[in-house]
Structures are given as C-alpha cells and as structure tokens.
Design a protein with these regions (language model features):
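Iron-sulfur cluster-binding electron-transfer modules in prokaryotic oxidoreductases
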Residues: 1-281
Length: 281
C-alpha cells in the first residue's frame, strides 16, 4: 500500500523526467505560460491515464508550447462530488481551485479529461472562475491547423481501422464532435463510425460518478454494451478522448477476450505512437 505523500513524490519525479514546468516556479520568475495544463485526478494518479498525460506532454514539448501545471496545488475539480449529489464538497473543491487559478492570473486551460473540461468551462464561472478552456483534442487540432504537427504518409496507423467513442461530457454536453475526428484524420487510417455516435452516442457507463460505484443489477453493464457496438465495426483500434471512457472500453475489450487484437488508445497516444512527433525533429 502506498501513501498519498509517496505517490506525490513519484509523480514529482515523473514530472521532472518529462520536462513539465510547474506554475509556482514560473510565477516566482515572473513568467506566465501560454496555457495551463490541467492534469486531473485520473491523469495524475491512475497508471493508465498517466500514459496519456505523458503523451500529451510530449506533444506540447515537441510543438514548443509554453505551458505549466499546478502540480500539488491542483485539486479535484469536484465533478464526481457534484454528480454524486455532494454539492457542499463540490463548492469547497471548486473554491480552492478558483482561488489558486485566479491567484496566478490563469486565463487559458487545456485538459485531457472531458469531466474536468466540462466543470472548468461551464460550472466554475458561476463561482468566479472564468477561463478559456480547451479539451486536448481541440488543442491538438489547433496545433495541426497551425502547421506545428503533421504526419507524412499517415505514420504507423496508416490503413488501420479505427472507431472513435464519443465521451458524453465532450460530445453531448459540449458539442465537441469534429475535433477528435480531425485529429484522427492525420493518421490516414480508416475511421469507422459506430451505429450510435456523435449526438446519439452511448455512454461508456462511467459518467455521473458511476465510475466510482458498483453497477446496479441488470442484464448487461453499459460498458459491455458499448464495447460490443465498437467491436461490431471490426476495428484494430478503439480511440477515446477521456480517461474514464478509456478504462471502461478497455474493460469491455477484456470481457470480450479481444485484448490481443483490439487496442484502446487516447488520441494523444495515437499521435505520439504514429510518429507525428518525428516529422519536425
């Protein structure tokens, strides 16, 4: 069993290896980053999601984006608390984060978690936290449009069948459907849509704080249903843009005993593994 302090030490060591600036250090030098990378609880503490964090940091560094993280000053956005009905805890967490962000004068935020994205963008303003918030799919799309990121010949995934799962908090809650698909286009892969996609997409089963509780009794768990829809497209890869969706779809693939033939990746991982970062070295 590992303590929170030990986990934070490990995370600090990983951050140093990845060349991740910390906001407090920049502020001490009177510097302001172009954007604050909000890592989120999953991206900080979940081993699978940490790989997504690392991939996105690689993209930011490769594209020479001026960014920073809050490090140990970053707290949970409070999304799970509010979804579970604990409004007091949500407002307490939000107030602490807003005080930190406003104290640094932060205006631009990017995050790899749609839950953090939705909360920071749509729920913090009523509490005094007004920021320009982007999901990493939007940010990567912007880097591609600016010519800072490209992939000649499609890279590693050229010709592979990829199906993309729409996160509820990115898609239906915020209308972000095209950005992740535009990012996938530079892979020159075959993008195959599920029968329920975009505004009609099916939840992975982790939304509304369901990630942190046991499923109610029923005929089938939601993530199994959703994964079956994904597998119907006969994909080589299931692409996700949310740490919760990534976990649920991965579990669904394991349930179907397809983990050897079907992989679940975040879009940032696909960009890195597709060798997009080598084109500008």
């Amino acid at each position: 069993r590992i303590t929170i302090d030990e986990l934070r030490i490990t995370i600090n060591e990983q951050r140093s290896k990845m060349n991740v600036p910390v906001m407090s250090d920049l502020a001490a030098r009177g510097e302001m980053p172009e954007v604050l990378f909000w890592v989120g609880c999953a991206g900080s503490f979940d081993q699978r999601a940490q790989k997504v964090t690392g991939a996105f940091v690689q993209i930011l560094n490769h594209c020479k984006v001026s960014f920073a993280v809050l490090g140990t000053e970053e707290g949970c956005t409070g999304d799970p608390a509010r979804r579970a009905g604990n409004e007091f805890l949500f407002q307490m967490l939000a107030a602490n984060n807003i005080a930190t962000l406003n104290g640094y004068g932060i205006r631009n935020i990017v995050t790899t978690c749609p839950h953090c994205f939705n909360t920071l963008k749509n729920e913090y303003p009523e509490l005094g936290g007004n920021y320009e918030v982007m999901h990493h799919s939007q940010f990567i799309q912007q880097l591609i449009a600016e010519g800072k990121l490209s992939m000649q010949g499609g890279g590693t995934f050229k010709g592979k069948r990829i199906t993309y799962h729409d996160s509820c908090y990115l898609g239906r809650a915020n209308g972000v459907y095209e950005a992740p698909r535009a990012v996938l286009e530079i892979l020159d892969a075959e993008l195959v849509e599920m029968k329920r996609c975009k505004s009609k997409g099916l939840c992975c089963g982790a939304g509304g704080a369901q990630m942190f509780k046991e499923a109610e009794a029923g005929e089938k768990e939601v993530n199994i249903e959703r994964t079956e829809e994904a597998l119907e497209t006969k994909p080589d890869i299931i692409a996700a843009a949310c740490p919760f969706c990534n976990t649920m779809m991965t579990d669904g693939v394991k349930h179907a005993e397809k983990e050897d033939s079907v992989k679940v990746y975040d879009i940032a991982e696909l960009i890195v593994q597709g060798n997009a970062l080598l084109e500008h070295e």
